[in-house]
Amino acid sequence: MKYVFYSLLIFFIVACNSKKRSINYEEVNYKVEYKGALKNMMQKGDISAKVDLKEIENLENIYALGALENLKGEIQIFDSKPFNTMVTDSVLTFDNSFNKKATLLVFASINKWKSISIPTAVVSHEQLEKYIEQEAKKNQIDTDKPFPFLMEGSPKSIDWHVINWNTYDTVHSHDKHISSGLNGSIKNKPVKILGFYSSSHHAIFTHHTTNMHMHVKTLDNSLAGHLDEIILGKGMIFKLPDNSPTSYVN
């Protein structure tokens, strides 16, 4: 009888510990959602609207990025505030409304973030990708599922573009997307960066060579668009969804 009692006790302890370990992931109630897929653009030339931005207009704490329908601009939404950009007569223009449709959209509702200082050793795009995965695991984020992140500070340089696709062109490539509209570099300028990380959404919302999709906005709101390359500067801050109980969203 004694052995039965101890066996049941051990089983109960193991079960409780297993449940506690799973809580770290299961209680994170934010969900990354997406509409559209990069592979449909690149392989099929499908750049039609997949979602109306008005569908997320009334959601709180929305962070979103993507491309406008027909690839006529970039989508950046920070904390439910749109900073969408387009090219009009070779000039960058902003649209701060939800009166647009997207051919690709990735979004999540996050009401609290945890700030982390990025080590000075993290400089390149590749180093950043490894660092993001490492920090996510440290902070009990399930890296088998997509998650959003933010960065703030003054990078040494950022290469960016805002797409302005010729709708009669049915042959797509990443280089053609970059050159179709406006593109350039930002150097040593304070910015805010929104990104989504996933190792399982290649050709869906990340390109096949990376686990990250990032967009950038300058703090003075003079520029926003797709981030192509980055060299980090000193003192930059990285932010992950805060997994503490007070940060849960329904």
Predicted regions and their residues:
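Sec-dependent signal peptide recognition
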Residues: 2-9
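C-terminal motif of bacterial Sec signal peptides marking the signal peptidase cleavage site
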Residues: 12-15
